[in-house]
Amino acid sequence: MARIVMLGACGKMGREISKNLLMHSEHELVGFVDVVNVGQDFGEILGISRLGKTVEDNLKEVILKTNPEIVLDFSRASGAFTNILIALENKVRVVSGTTGFSQEQIKKIEDVSNANNLGCIIAPNFSIGALLLMKLAQMAAKYFSHVEIIEYHHNLKVDAPSGTAIKTAELLSSIRENQPSAIQEEEKIPGSRGGDYRGIKIHSVRLPGLVAHQEVIFGGRGQSLTLRHDVYSRESYLDGILFALKKVLELDRFVFGLDELLF
């Protein structure tokens, strides 16, 4: 069992994961940090009985008061970067599902984590199914010369493309070079062919009713292969989060992506 502070507690992911951890986990949630609903009892925010713990907006003060072992972060990159560094500098391990960090920010977090010999996991996706999709895509990439990625999310997601799509493109580009188009393409509407990551096109869809979905489509001579993963509920992330919470206590270094620990 670990003592955990939830960062970004009042967001959709923060609320869903907090409720599941409170109901189905041996871990103890000792603090809740967010910039909204400050001063309110977190149990009432979740629609359950009062917890006797209110939402606070200063992570360092919460750490000093509650002495946690892990900060679990589902906030936004704009604030998460500073707060992750605060946690590590105060000798608290971090598991983060926040996306949208720059490469420079990730490198800084890695440096601070390693310098303090503290486990820190930043994972673009905690869904075991999504991680398996990426693994299968790596296998398929050895046999197909063309690939594109389509990711679908709810219309309130602020960053595009998703961290999972970027991670997938990174994995694919590390083992193969995407073949350029056989023709000179002309975009009648700029951006209509999607974003480009090292020759791999990524397309982002944002619509109400969606949660999180991704397709990796491979094309070859006379055939295509489509790999798809769908998340219908944020509960799908719980198994991966529990796995990360266990593993981060064993780590003394930075890890990006659960795939390094799973496979």
UniProtKB/Swiss-Prot annotation:
Reactions listed under catalytic activity: (S)-2,3,4,5-tetrahydrodipicolinate + NAD(+) + H2O = (2S,4S)-4-hydroxy-2,3,4,5-tetrahydrodipicolinate + NADH + H(+); (S)-2,3,4,5-tetrahydrodipicolinate + NADP(+) + H2O = (2S,4S)-4-hydroxy-2,3,4,5-tetrahydrodipicolinate + NADPH + H(+)
EC assignment: 1.17.1.8
Pfam families: DapB_C (PF05173), DapB_N (PF01113)
Subcellular location field: Cytoplasm
A single GO BP: diaminopimelate biosynthetic process
Sequence positions that bind NAD(+): G8, A9, C10, G11, K12, M13, D34, G97, T98, T99, A123, P124, N125, F126
Known role: Catalyzes the conversion of 4-hydroxy-tetrahydrodipicolinate (HTPA) to tetrahydrodipicolinate.
SUPFAM superfamilies given in the database record: Glyceraldehyde-3-phosphate dehydrogenase-like, C-terminal domain, NAD(P)-binding Rossmann-fold domains
Residue positions binding (S)-2,3,4,5-tetrahydrodipicolinate: H154, G163, T164
UniProt keyword annotations, A-Z: Amino-acid biosynthesis, Cytoplasm, Diaminopimelate biosynthesis, Lysine biosynthesis, NAD, NADP, Oxidoreductase
Protein family per UniProt: Belongs to the DapB family.
Gene: dapB
Record-linked NCBIfam families: dapB
Enzyme class, UniProt record, top EC level: oxidoreductase
InterPro entries linked: DapB_C, DapB_N, DapB_N_CS, DHDPR_bac, NAD(P)-bd_dom_sf
Keyword Amino-acid biosynthesis: yes
Gene3D superfamilies in the record: Dihydrodipicolinate Reductase, domain 2 (3.30.360.10), NAD(P)-binding Rossmann-like Domain (3.40.50.720)
Protein name per UniProt: 4-hydroxy-tetrahydrodipicolinate reductase
Origin species: Carboxydothermus hydrogenoformans (strain ATCC BAA-161 / DSM 6008 / Z-2901)
Transmembrane portions of the chain: none
GO MF entries: 4-hydroxy-tetrahydrodipicolinate reductase; NAD binding; NADP binding; oxidoreductase activity, acting on CH or CH2 groups, NAD or NADP as acceptor
